[in-house]
Amino acid sequence: MPIFFYLFTTLIIISSLCVVLSKNSVYSVLWLIFAFINGSGLMILLGAEFLAMMLIVIYVGAVAVLFLFVIMMLDMHFNKAIMQLKEKPILSIFVSLIMFADLVVIILLGTKNIHFSSDLSFAIASDVSNTKAIGKILYTDFMIPFQIAGLILFVAMIGCITLTLRKRDGVKRQNIAKQLSHNKENAVLMTKPLINKGIENIKYE
């Protein structure tokens, strides 16, 4: 079904460009969800129904929704960051060129030993399920890249936790040690307020 392949591919490219070019971060996440849905359509065309379902359940149902909640909850000043990048155009261009060169090298090295065919699908053994084929390859030939990917995700999780633990002005925090050290002598304050003064002369620690 070449028409569906080109349809899903075109929609993925358009939605990916919208993810990068959208000024509103919430819209970027919505376009990212749309790209994941079209990617699952490609997986179905290739006969990998398990991967298509995992792409919907994990990426759309968990990761993309998590991105949406994080962006809406954290106070991210994207406009301020964009203005800082505009003040340093040389640095921005240099970083962009490095990332572009990195992508070119990855594409060239990744497609060096691949023999393309006119057929858009590939042969899958009928007696082997998607999960068995993925597990056999993932935990044998790609064992080290799989562990490295897990380590990268672990570092990203630590970074997210660090972002949420930043100190904010005006937020009252508990002092557990001070609360536990209270006794009956310092927990209750006995005082005798002056007439017509109320509690103005009372000092609290």
Curated annotation (Swiss-Prot):
Q: What does this protein do?
A: NDH-1 shuttles electrons from NADH, via FMN and iron-sulfur (Fe-S) centers, to quinones in the respiratory chain. Couples the redox reaction to proton translocation (for every two electrons transferred, four hydrogen ions are translocated across the cytoplasmic membrane), and thus conserves the redox energy in a proton gradient.
- Name residues in a coiled coil: none
Q: EC number(s) on record?
A: 7.1.1.-
Taxonomically, the superkingdom here is Bacteria
Where is the signal peptide, in residue numbers?
none
Listed name of the protein: NADH-quinone oxidoreductase subunit J
Q: Its gene?
A: nuoJ
GO terms, molecular function: NADH dehydrogenase (ubiquinone) activity; quinone binding
- Which EC class is this protein assigned? translocase
Q: How does it sit in the membrane?
A: Multi-pass membrane protein
The Swiss-Prot or TrEMBL record describes its family as follows: Belongs to the complex I subunit 6 family.
Provide the transmembrane region boundaries. Answer: 1-21, 26-46, 54-74, 89-109, 142-162
What Gene Ontology cellular component terms go with this record? Answer: plasma membrane
| Cellular compartments annotated | Cell membrane
Q: Which InterPro entries did the record assign? A: NADH_UbQ/plastoQ_OxRdtase_su6, Nuo/plastoQ_OxRdtase_6_NuoJ
Keywords in alphabetical order: Cell membrane, Membrane, NAD, Quinone, Translocase, Transmembrane, Transmembrane helix
Q: Which reaction does it catalyse?
A: a quinone + NADH + 5 H(+)(in) = a quinol + NAD(+) + 4 H(+)(out)
